[in-house]
Amino acid sequence: MTAAPASPQQIRDRLLQAIDPQSNIRNMVAVLEVISSLEKYPITKEALEETRLGKLINDVRKKTKNEELAKRAKKLLRSWQKLIEPAHQHEAALRGLAGATGSANGGAHNCRPEVGAAGPPRSIHDLKSRNDLQRLPGQRLDRLGSRKRRGDQRDLGHPGPPPKVSKASHDPLVPNSSPLPTNGISGSPESFASSLDGSGHAGPEGSRLERDENDKHSGKIPVNAVRPHTSSPGLGKPPGPCLQPKASVLQQLDRVDETPGPPHPKGPPRCSFSPRNSRHEGSFARQQSLYAPKGSVPSPSPRPQALDATQVPSPLPLAQPSTPPVRRLELLPSAESPVCWLEQPESHQRLAGPGCKAGLSPAEPLLSRAGFSPDSSKADSDAASSGGSDSKKKKRYRPRDYTVNLDGQVAEAGVKPVRLKERKLTFDPMTRQIKPLTQKEPVRADSPVHMEQQSRTELDKQEAKASLQSPFEQTNWKELSRNEIIQSYLSRQSSLLSSSGAQTPGAHHFMSEYLKQEESTRQGARQLHVLVPQSPPTDLPGLTREVTQDDLDRIQASQWPGVNGCQDTQGNWYDWTQCISLDPHGDDGRLNILPYVCLD
């Protein structure tokens, strides 16, 4: 019989017993056992949020000097990070599914751009002439730009280039790569049929027949699957459910052709894509389904190559005005990545004349027309697709440290500036959930929050200085303390200071100190009604000496404190048969003492 595995709460308790409050290890054996059990335990995101084990393990990793323990803790934290990030990506994909506009039967048909509705179908002869044009050898782009693009592609999370294929596989016409239905939407079986599946390339005749067959199928898509909007000439239509990388590049080029201005002659297709692009496309379609924007179904398109050859103006636009700008930028990796693949020198791509080189430029005006520069869109797309990618295993995440002076001025000598670390995940104490950090920029020194805190701190310091400079004797604090306006102001100031966490003492601090002193002096000035304290007697008749007749006369005829009665501070005499009423605190409270002797 094996013991039941410990719950995350029990593991957390064991870890807390093995470390001190500063995360220093007191019991190394127990910490190693906790790490081992956590490595085997299939923990969930909810358990991590409840127990805050990630923070505890990270603190232990920072404090420990055991390198092996630090490595194991880091590996464990990385695995948890991958566990949390895909959950957020899955939620984004589900939101995209909920807001999508599909067909009447729930989107069971395959998602294709409606090529037949936008223009007349091309004849086989026309396709053949285009085919011949595509076989022309193009120019190769410079190595410097390709290196830059390769770096961008690696940042976007794509795996490296695939192994080289023979020149026989560089046929310009590529049939449909089999799409990956990541969201459960079933595709039509005829679109999956491809003669490339077995051999990796196909003859031109089979490709032309298959294109013609696909053009016939393209007229069967329901009308309500694609709803064009007419709000602006270039960007006014919503994104279609299936935006594929190559299709989106061609749509961008067509959009630039359709914008008002001097008309561009429609030339031959700009780029020829080899079968290796379809492999890139498969991996990219898998990632695109994770980062699909709200309102689009992340389903891969089964026939992007039909758009490559026919160059028909597609009704599918690039961006939807109703989507927020950040989400709109998430489409941009699909617009840039095919160009990156074309520019790789290892991939033996041939470009169809100068048309492809000229075709790279219209993407940038399109971005600037949307209100974003290409550099910022590249940075946003890098950030959007950084999580959950395969390249994490190759490229380790190195957090950047930013040095920020919160006062916005030159730091004084001997004062350390605050160091802020950029993190990918953060714990929200309000919702008690672990969330990806949305703010990727360093906190600026001129941000309004810090300016507000800075001004509030300066006000508190000035107030403290003013109150220190004016002594108590110059102000009638007693009258001020009774004023309702002053009291409300002081209470509000006190709550503000406590909420902002400032340690500077304000006027309320000195007021309370003064009131305490006044209270103590007032208590001293009150008349206390108590018994007169008696010093211990030195002359004790009957103990230190013999009892005499004078002692007996004194007991009977005169007042002898402590012997035949007692006296209070107001001069009243009480014998042992009387009740004594006193006010020991000076607050008008009465203390009644019963008689010492009862003569009933």
Curated annotation (Swiss-Prot):
Keywords annotated in UniProt: Activator, Nucleus, Phosphoprotein, Transcription, Transcription regulation
User: Where mainly located?
Assistant: nucleus
Q: Could you provide one GO biological process annotation from this protein's UniProt record?
A: positive regulation of transcription elongation by RNA polymerase II
Q: Which GO terms describe its molecular function?
A: transcription coactivator activity; transcription coregulator activity
Return the Pro residues bias intervals: 314-324
Keyword tRNA processing on entry: no
Localization per record: Nucleus
> Which residues are connected by disulfide bridges in this protein?
none
Q: Which family does it belong to?
A: Belongs to the Mediator complex subunit 26 family.
What's its job? Component of the Mediator complex, a coactivator involved in the regulated transcription of nearly all RNA polymerase II-dependent genes. Mediator functions as a bridge to convey information from gene-specific regulatory proteins to the basal RNA polymerase II transcription machinery. Mediator is recruited to promoters by direct interactions with regulatory proteins and serves as a scaffold for the assembly of a functional pre-initiation complex with RNA polymerase II and the general transcription factors.
Q: Which PANTHER family match?
A: CRSP70, MEDIATOR OF RNA POLYMERASE II TRANSCRIPTION SUBUNIT 26
Name of the molecule in the record: Mediator of RNA polymerase II transcription subunit 26
Annotated source species:
Homo sapiens
